[in-house]
Structure formats: structure tokens, C-alpha cells
Amino acid sequence: MYRYISVSEELSSPYLGRYRSFGFAAQREAAGHWQVVCKVSDVSTDPVFVENLAARCTAGQLEPVHLMDIIEDALI
């Protein structure tokens, strides 16, 4: 079983300065514990967008190998 969670990050860019962004962590349940199997950083500055997409990925039990494609499609 997989679950996807939003991850808040404080980042810095030479063009933007400091900013808060949100990424994803894919976790797999193993022996009663959740282990991170994949992380994608700096997806969006909109926390609701990332949380909603994470919930859809969890509900659909998305394989982490497809996460980048799903994120790209959602951003277009």
C-alpha cells in the first residue's frame, strides 16, 4: 500500500529569493511502518493543489514510478 503526502519546503532561488514550496513524498507501508520510497521537491507554491493531488494519488494507489508523469499532467 502506498500513501502520498505533501511536504512543505523553504527554498531559495537567486531570481526569487526565499520562498515556500510544496512537494510530494511517496511512502510504502512495510512491517507496520511507513517508509519514504520517492520524493519530488518544489512542485507548487499552492499547498491545496499539492494536497489534492497527493490524495488522488493515494486513492488510486499510484505506483511511484508514475509520479512525475502525473505531476506534469496536473501542471499543464
Where are these regions (language model features)?
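Short N-terminal "domain-start" leader segments
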Residues: 1-23
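A short, exposed loop/beta-hairpin motif centered on an aromatic-Gly-Thr core
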Residues: 34-48, 57
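Surface-exposed loop/turn and secondary-structure junction residues enriched for glycine/proline
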Residues: 14, 43-46, 65
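Compositionally biased, intrinsically disordered linkers/stalks adjacent to structured regions
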Residues: 51-76
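Generic structural motif
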Residues: 9-11, 29, 43
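Exposed acidic/polar residues on beta-strands and adjacent loops within beta-sheet cores, strongest
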Residues: 8, 20, 25, 41, ...
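Short aromatic-glycine-(Arg/Gly/Cys) micro-motifs in beta-strand/loop hairpins
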Residues: 16-36
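Residue-level marker of intrinsically disordered, low-complexity segments enriched
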Residues: 3-5, 34-38, 68-69
